[in-house]
Amino acid sequence: MTTISPDYQVIVVGTGFSGLGMGIALKKAGINSFAILEKADDVGGTWRDNHYPGCACDVQSHLYSFSFEPNPSWTRMYAPQPEIKKYLQHCARKYGLMPQIQFGQEVKKAIYDEQNKLWRLETAAGKTITSRMVVSGMGGLSTAAYPNIKGLNTFK
């Protein structure tokens, strides 16, 4: 049996705290065969997407950061959205993640290929990317995709 080599060992989806944190952890572990797929044109997740008046974190700033990258420069106890977004941009650059991030790649499907033991991710841009592992860092504010299971709509 011929095995197909995946494009990457790991695909991370999203560039909020979860996705960037995973990317940093992979680099620290010496795993460099990974990509981070991001639907938008910049990092930041919810802190990039939400910018209404008064948008801020409801967790104290010193706790709302990576333990390995404290930010002593928060201007308020509860950081405003622009500062959090800037912090995430700083982390992505400082830890060398920018080359691994593929912007404009919204994942529409993730299908596990049993025969080849790899994941096939399909993006809205029509790209197919393969990996051995997938880590979702899309967060709770993303639109969920429900499986097409017979009887799902009538289940009580």
PLM regions and their residue ranges:
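N-terminal Rossmann-like FAD-binding beta1-loop-alpha1 element of flavoenzymes
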Residues: 8-36
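Catalytic P-loop NTPase motifs of RecA-like helicase/translocase cores
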Residues: 20, 43-44, 144
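Glycine-rich FAD pyrophosphate-binding loop
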Residues: 27-52
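Glycine-rich active-site loop/strand segments that organize a redox cofactor
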Residues: 48-90
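Feature captures the FAD/FMN-dependent oxidoreductase FAD-binding
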Residues: 76-142
